[in-house]
Design a protein with these regions (language model features):
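Glycine-rich loop-to-alpha-helix module at the N-terminal edge of alpha/beta enzyme cores
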Residues: 46-128
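Active-site-adjacent loop/helix segments that line or gate small-molecule/cofactor pockets in enzymes
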Residues: 1-33, 174
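Active-site and channel-lining beta-strand-loop segments
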Residues: 28-49
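Conserved PLP-anchoring active-site segment centered on the Schiff-base-forming lysine
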Residues: 123-145
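PLP-dependent aminotransferase-class I/II
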Residues: 137-199, 207
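Catalytic PLP-binding core of fold-type I/II PLP enzymes
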Residues: 206-239
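Conserved active-site segment immediately N-terminal to the catalytic lysine
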Residues: 244-258
Length: 258
C-alpha cells in the first residue's frame, strides 16, 4: 500500500511523522481497523497500539459509550456551520477545568490554535518577536516551524524550507531549559510571547523542570511578555487541568487538542 500511495501522495503519507523513518521502518503501517488497545493493518497483522492516533484515543479505540454518543449526535446532523449548544457546554467545562482559561475559541487543528494564540499575543502586546524552544513542536505554521522537532526532521528535510526569511526572522529559537538565554533575550528585545510545551513530546516526552517553567512565568510578567503553554499533547493527561495544574503554574494563554 505504501508503494501504491507514493505516486499520488507526496512521500506516501499525509504527515511526516507517519512515515515511521524515526523507528527505522522501510514503510509505514497502513491501518485497517482497531478495537480497544489493538490495531490491525491491511495485511491483518495485529499490533498493541501505543500511538493512539497521536493522542486522541486515550480511552482506546471504539469504546461503546463513545460510539453511542457519536451515533446519537450524527442523527441530528453532521455539520451546520452555525453555533451549537454543545460548543457552549464544552467551553463552560474547559473554563471550569483548566486554570488559565477564562474564555474559549474553538479551532479545527492544533496548528490553527497555536497560530491564533501567537497572533493574539502580538496584537495584545503590539510586538512582533516571539520565543520558542528547540525541539518543541507547535504545528506547521510558518512562524513556528523552526527547529521544531517534528517528523520533518526524520525525513531528511530542514524544517524551515519554503519559509521566507522575513517570516521566521521574528521567531527566536532558544535551547530548551536555558533560562539565562531567555532572560538575555527579554532584556534586549521586545518579545510578544514565549510559547512552550510544558512537557515536550516531540523530543522524547521530556518532563520539564518546574523551576524553568516558574522562571518563565516570573520573567514574562516582569517584561510584559505573554506566556503560552502549548498543551495540545499534555492537556487532560498529566492532570485534568493539564501540565499547568500539575506544575501549579498558570500561563496567560494555552492551546489544547487531541
Amino acid at each position: 500500500y505504501f508503494q501504491a500511495a507514493c505516486p499520488y501522495i507526496p512521500g506516501g503519507v499525509n504527515t511526516p511523522v507517519r512515515a515511521f523513518q524515526s523507528v527505522h521502518r522501510d514503510a509505514p503501517i497502513f491501518a485497517k481497523k482497531a478495537k480497544g488497545a489493538y490495531l490491525w493493518d491491511e495485511d491483518e497483522n495485529r499490533y498493541l497500539d501505543y500511538i493512539c492516533s497521536w493522542g486522541p484515543m486515550i480511552l482506546g479505540h471504539n469504546p461503546e459509550f463513545v460510539l453511542q454518543g457519536v451515533q446519537e449526535a450524527i442523527l441530528s446532523g453532521s455539520s451546520f456551520g452555525l453555533p451549537t449548544k454543545g460548543e457552549v457546554e464544552l467551553a463552560k467545562l474547559l473554563v471550569k477545568t483548566v486554570p488559565c482559561i477564562e474564555t474559549v475559541r474553538l479551532t479545527t487543528s492544533g496548528t490553527e490554535a497555536t497560530m491564533s494564540a501567537v497572533r493574539l499575543a502580538r496584537a495584545y502586546t503590539k510586538r512582533n518577536k516571539i520565543i520558542k524552544f528547540e525541539g518543541c513542536y507547535h504545528g506547521h505554521s510558518d512562524a513556528l516551524l523552526v527547529k521544531s522537532g517534528s517528523g520533518l526532521l526524520t525525513q531528511g528535510f530542514q524544517d524551515s524550507n519554503g519559509i521566507p526569511h522575513s517570516i521566521f526572522e521574528d521567531t527566536v529559537t532558544l535551547p530548551f531549559g536555558d533560562i539565562e538565554q531567555v532572560i538575555s533575550m527579554l532584556q534586549s528585545q521586545k518579545i510578544a510571547c514565549i510559547i512552550v510545551e510544558p512537557i515536550p513530546a516531540n523530543m522524547g516526552v521530556i518532563e520539564s523542570q518546574k523551576e524553568f517553567l516558574q522562571s518563565l512565568r516570573e520573567e514574562t510578567i516582569k517584561y510584559g511578555t505573554l506566556l503560552i503553554f502549548d498543551e495540545v499533547i499534555s492537556g487532560f493527561r498529566v492532570a485534568l487541568g493539564g501540565a499547568q495544574e500539575y506544575f501549579g503554574i498558570t500561563p496567560d494563554l494555552c492551546t489544547l487538542g487531541k
